[in-house]
From Swiss-Prot:
Gene3D superfamilies: 1.10.1420.10, 6.10.140.430, DNA repair protein MutS, domain I (3.40.1170.10), MutS, connector domain (3.30.420.110), P-loop containing nucleotide triphosphate hydrolases (3.40.50.300). GO terms for cellular component: cytosol. This is DNA mismatch repair protein MutS. The lineage of its organism: Bacteria, Pseudomonadati, Pseudomonadota, Gammaproteobacteria, Aeromonadales. ATP binds at G616, P617, N618, M619, G620, G621, K622, S623. Disulfide bonds: none annotated. It comes from the Bacteria. SMART domains: MUTSac, MUTSd. InterPro entries: DNA_mismatch_repair_MutS, DNA_mismatch_repair_MutS-lik_N, DNA_mismatch_repair_MutS/MSH, DNA_mismatch_repair_MutS_C, DNA_mismatch_repair_MutS_clamp, DNA_mismatch_repair_MutS_core, DNA_mismatch_repair_MutS_N, DNA_mismatch_repair_MutS_sf.
């Protein structure tokens, strides 16, 4: 630990360090010393472990050795990238004073703070994934949740009542950094995440949030953004804005608005559904064999990020969806998607370049990327000029051209500039007369030095005499020691080497001062011109962001057109009737990884057929069939074409899945508890317009308990909720449900035995399966034959003895728990604080009649 109580006991340099560290106590401080960034004390110990760098000790301060670790200044980006991946933050401290005029340590300042959620440096970001920072707040009644993408300026807020929704939002947005108040009572939902930041309560104060946001947007109030009444969400947004301002230490002109996300505008998916459908991450945590991997052939990183946002937030607005479908169809019919893709590949990641421009951290090569993008826009306009499709024209208009800015960048910036402005050589020759003159003076040194060298050779008669330069001693005349007796008296010795002597003369010293002054002046002028370039671009930021947004959307639509043509997808029909009708549907991911042809299957769900009881052997394809239905419905709700011969899809508000489970050891929940929690979420939140996938409910407990729960869940979904439901089960007793209730049907996936082998047909057929083929699957898995034979004998015994096999059990009547009285059910559903006196009186009379 650092003791700063007696700071005067420390050396002046360590006093400076400790003062800066006190301003940034919770993050690693990289302190510039010469060609290294140094870390001291606890920071050094922590960095040595995280970055695998040496921990040493240097001298003493306040009587104690100083633990120290360091990294070369030119390699800092690689170390920062590693820290960001680990969820850590860093403060970069640079020398800002002039060593020549400084008394004591050179003045240093923290010039930037890098955190996982606010990083904008290209080298520290994954280019095809959003990098979000989020804040969560709970006011005792509801949650407020805000997200910001500093790389694009997108700023969203949301508020909701349920913990399940918080989990779903965290799964959907996957923030790199999450801010939460000190009193946050739901830490169990965020523990284990990287980038957690606990913030003081006052940062979530509503009045402060309103003031901060109004200052940022230059408005009197927040009414125009439609967020004024969302007070809990605004508390989270205020903390978010304050944190970003504190870390960036500059204006944020690209953050121009905040939007309230409306749950009723989206097809809602909980965390389990996103995980089970493997949208952008597979069950093992990777990217391979996900929906995004199959769909994403976008030409630009910003298009790739937009596609993933669409996948994670399917929408219900039929006008927008049909507009996307129509645009995709147009790009296919006019064969435009390939040419568009080729042009857009030259555009690159304009969105993040503009963010760095707004933050004034844009590097010279960012400007060349902008120049390259601007150069493609006229060609893109020509490509789309003759197209009369309304949506295509609107996108073309939004992706406007910027000829003046293109001309400026072509005149101002070198074709291939260096990485950093501090290296010079960024501004093109001919752009500024004063800069050209200074460069001529600095670059003319070679010719002048040759002239001086030839003259001195002639005057001294020393043919081996050389004029040279190094950074330590400047310009010099070098003479071999053997010829040193020939050196004139006005030569002043500057350096003695083993075999040579180095001298200086007045003319060379004056020329050195002149050249070095010209170089310094040229670099200072070049930096000023570069800043002026940024100043010229910044007023166009809003238009540039709008153009980047249109280019990203055009990229996604062209990509979806290419995917539809390449993968044989068809345009789904969005209908108003309660129906899901898919002909020859396919799983978009499984069909790409299979070596054998994929067996396409139909599905029909409608008012009189809202639940399918699905039976069949393990490995028969039940889960694939269920998931493909959900993915086809999801694709239809991002406006994409779908893997099917045809699809008619009615209104959907939510997609739920209860497929597979594992222990949640961190929360102390068993597999069965996880299964029941997910099931409860479905039963409490599904509606008649929800799509529900239920796979093997009840298998984590005893046969009778599991069967009873499965039966009751199926009844609830079918009769009370009326959701579109695919209910896969090994409880063959459930196949009796269609006989007992309306709106249900049996389907099955069959298999055929050939001697000791089994062939799975993968084709969905009407009716219930005749058997499960469990022993055959066990044999395929390599279970020893002796075990299989013993299992066959046991199966025969059970089939002859158990009432389950003979159909004698009526699962709905199995007494698991005491059946509650209707009056108790009614009372449990009552919310007393929400009842008017009249409603309370009516309730009393209603309860009395129920006794």
């Amino acid at each position: 630990m650092i003791n700063i109580e007696n700071i005067q006991q420390h050396t002046p340099m360590m006093q400076q360090y400790l003062g800066l560290k006190a301003e940034n106590p919770e993050i690693l401080l990289f302190y510039r010393m010469g060609d290294f960034y140094e870390l001291f004390y606890d920071d050094a110990r922590k960095a040595s472990q995280l970055l695998d760098i040496s921990l040493t000790k240097r001298g003493q301060s306040a009587g104690n050795p100083i633990p120290m670790a360091g990294v070369p200044y030119h390699a800092i980006e690689g170390y920062l990238a590693k820290l960001i991946q680990l969820g850590e933050s860093a403060a970069i401290c640079e020398q800002v004073g002039d060593p020549a005029t400084s008394k004591g340590p050179v003045e240093r300042k923290v010039i930037r703070i890098i955190t996982p959620g606010t990083v904008s440096d290209e080298a520290l970001l994954s280019e095809r994934q959003d990098n979000l920072i989020a804040a969560v707040y709970h006011d005792g009644r509801r949650f407020g949740y805000g997200t910001m993408d500093i790389g694009s300026g997108r700023f969203f807020i949301n508020q909701f009542d349920k913990e399940e929704t918080l989990l779903a939002e965290l799964q959907r947005t996957n923030p790199a950094e999450l801010l939460y108040p000190e009193s946050f009572a739901f830490l169990q939902h965020v523990e284990g995440r990287r980038g957690l930041r606990r913030r003081p309560e006052w940062e979530f104060e509503l009045g402060t949030a309103r003031k901060l946001l109004c200052q940022q947007f230059g408005t009197q109030d927040l009414v125009g953004f439609g967020v004024d009444k969302s007070e809990t969400a605004l508390c989270a947004a205020g903390c978010l804005m304050q944190y970003v301002k504190d870390t960036q230490r500059t204006a944020l002109p690209h953050i121009r608005s905040v939007r309230l996300e409306q749950p009723d505008h989206a097809v809602i998916m909980d965390a389990a559904t996103r995980r089970n459908l493997e949208l952008t991450q597979n069950l093992a945590g990777g990217y391979e064999n996900t929906l995004a991997e199959v769909l994403d052939r976008t030409a630009t990183p910003m298009g790739s990020r937009l596609l993933k946002r669409w996948i994670h937030q399917p929408i219900r607005d039929r006008v927008i969806l049909k507009g996307r479908q129509s645009t995709i169809k147009e790009l296919i019919e006019q064969n435009l998607y390939d040419e568009l893709g080729a042009l857009l590949r030259q555009v690159g990641d304009v969105e993040r370049v503009l963010a760095r421009l707004a933050l004034r951290s844009a590097r010279p090569r960012d400007l060349t990327r902008l120049r390259q993008a601007f150069a493609q826009l006229p060609e893109l306009q020509r490509l789309l000029a003759d197209n009369r499709h309304e949506a295509v024209q609107q996108l073309a208009e939004r992706a406007s051209t910027f000829p003046e800015l293109l001309s400026l960048l072509e005149r101002a910036v070198m074709e291939v500039p260096p990485v950093l402005i501090r290296d010079g050589g960024v501004i093109r020759d001919g752009f500024n007369q004063e800069l050209d003159e200074l460069r001529d003076l600095a670059n003319g040194a070679t010719a002048s030095l040759v002239r001086i060298e030839e003259r001195e050779k002639a005057l001294t008669g020393i043919n081996t005499l050389k004029v040279g330069y190094n950074r330590v001693h400047g310009f010099y005349i070098e003479v071999s020691r053997a010829n040193s007796h020939l050196v004139p008296a006005h030569y002043i010795r500057r350096q003695t080497l083993k075999n040579n002597e180095r001298y200086i003369i007045d003319e060379l010293k004056k020329y050195e001062d002149k050249v070095l002054t010209a170089q310094a002046q040229a670099l200072a002028l070049e930096k000023r011109l570069y800043e002026e370039l940024l100043d010229t671009l910044l007023p166009h930021l809003g238009d540039l962001q709008e153009s980047a947004s249109a280019l990203a959307e055009l990229d996604v639509l062209a990509n979806l057109a290419e995917r539809a043509e390449t993968l044989d997808y068809r345009c789904p029909t969005l209908i108003d009737e309660d129906q899901i009708l898919i002909e020859a549907g396919r799983h978009p991911v499984v069909e790409q990884v299979m070596s054998d042809p994929f067996i396409a299957n139909p599905i029909r769900l409608e008012r009189e057929r809202r639940m399918l009881i699905i039976t069949g052997p393990n490995m028969g394809g039940k889960s694939t069939y269920m998931r493909q239905t959900a993915l086809i419905v999801l694709l239809a709700h991002i406006g994409a074409f779908v893997p099917a011969d045809s699809a008619h899809i009615g209104p959907i508000d939510r997609i739920f899945t209860r497929i597979g489970a594992s222990d949640d050891l961190a929360s102390g929940r068993s597999t069965f508890m996880v299964e029941m929690t997910e099931t409860a979420n479905i039963l409490n939140n599904a509606t008649a317009r929800s799509l529900v996938l239920m796979d093997e409910i009840g298998r984590g407990t005893s046969t009778y308990d599991g069967l009873s729960l499965a039966w009751a869940c199926a009844e609830q979904l079918a009769s009370k909720i009326g959701a579109y439901t695919l209910f896969a089960t090994h409880y063959f007793e459930l196949t009796r449900l269609p006989e007992l209730m309306s709106g249900l049907a049996n389907v099955h996936l069959d298999a055929v035995e050939h001697g000791d082998t089994i062939a799975f047909m993968h084709a969905v057929q009407e009716g219930a399966a005749s058997r499960s083929y469990g022993l055959q699957v066990a044999a395929l898995a390599g279970v020893p034959k002796s075990v299989i034979n013993q299992a066959r004998h046991k199966l025969a015994e059970l089939e002859s003895a158990t009432p389950l096999a003979t159909g004698e059990v009526r699962p709905a009547s199995i007494p698991l728990l005491p059946q509650s009285h209707p009056v108790v059910d009614e009372l449990e559903a009552v919310r007393p604080d929400e009842l008017t006196p009249r409603q309370a009186l009516d309730l009393v009379y209603r309860l009395k009649q129920m006794l």
